Amino acid sequence: MKCFINFITGSKPSQYKKLGHAGIFRSSIPFSVEDFYKNHLEEGKVGSFFMRKIIIDCDPGIDDALAIMLAANSPELDILAITTVSGNVPSDMGAANARKVLKQLGRMDIPIYIGEEVPLREEYIDARDTHGMDGLGESFFPEVEGEYEKKNAVDFLTELLEREKISIIALGPMTNLAKVFSRKPELIANVEEMVSMGGSFKSHGNCSPVAEYNYWCDPDAAAVVYDLFAKAGSKIHMIGLDVTREIVLTPNRLEYMCRLDPEMGEFIRKITGFYMDFHWEQEGIIGCVINDPLAVAYFIDRSMCDGFDSFTVVATDGVCRGQTVVDSMNFWKKEPNSRILTETDSERFFAFFMERVLRKNDGSRWKKDE
């Protein structure tokens, strides 16, 4: 299976098509991940210059687990750390789940920082009705021994952004990020790109008529982050329900994954069975919507989704709690603080996901040098 690999390159620009953001080019030659590894990583041609430094801020969570699997198997990404926040599950349980996934991938080199336990103002309501009591579909994998990083995620992110420019893939409520940027708004200048799985434009909500769970769980945090990005003249790439609802892992796709890679396929089967039952009972869907991996795929390849720029605010109270109010008609005449993604190709996404994740390897290829 082939895919187009996006990467930062020192080769002649004339050989590549520009994707639309500085320094990133899309090769006109199809590469598999194996080809990319053989031709670049083994020969030492890819170092930190080629890889994009990222933080994954998440609340694992079934679909968060799948997103981590995709990110950890993508050679373009230098995962500096995973930070957890209370959302689908409490932040400490999310850290334990992230560790279980990293062990499965052979990526125990990635540090985990535990973040905020409760939303800024609202009572914390988890999503274990959707993700199971353990957050991984009641698979109840054994706990992975070891200590987490002692520093709180908010302090870690603050200190990291004071030192260097990074990108953030936010897959959960924005509580950690709201605390970081409220404390030091100037640090937004060191966020090269922010991709957030959350919100909705025209699609209905998944925990209220109008709201997606991540923003509904801590609406004040989402509102703060969108407001601060507007004041900083920056944009959040919003991977909302308009596109993620297209990404349905069906029983047929799951069976195909198990045939391609029995070990990894069975791991995915164990964590998604509960999720599939929930989607059938609640929405009549045969399969399950896996939101978060699309955010990772889009971060790697901008052509995975399409949309438009807009000024967006997040409602914080009443029946509209957590709703993303997108000024698509420019009534407010304000500079965009978001890119709203509205179109995606599910078949292309699943080809991308399976080509990267379903390979038998111990993950050591993508480990950072000791």
Describe the role of every protein-language-model region.
Residues R52, A95-L161, P336-T344, F349-L358, ...:
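Metal-dependent C-N hydrolase catalytic cores
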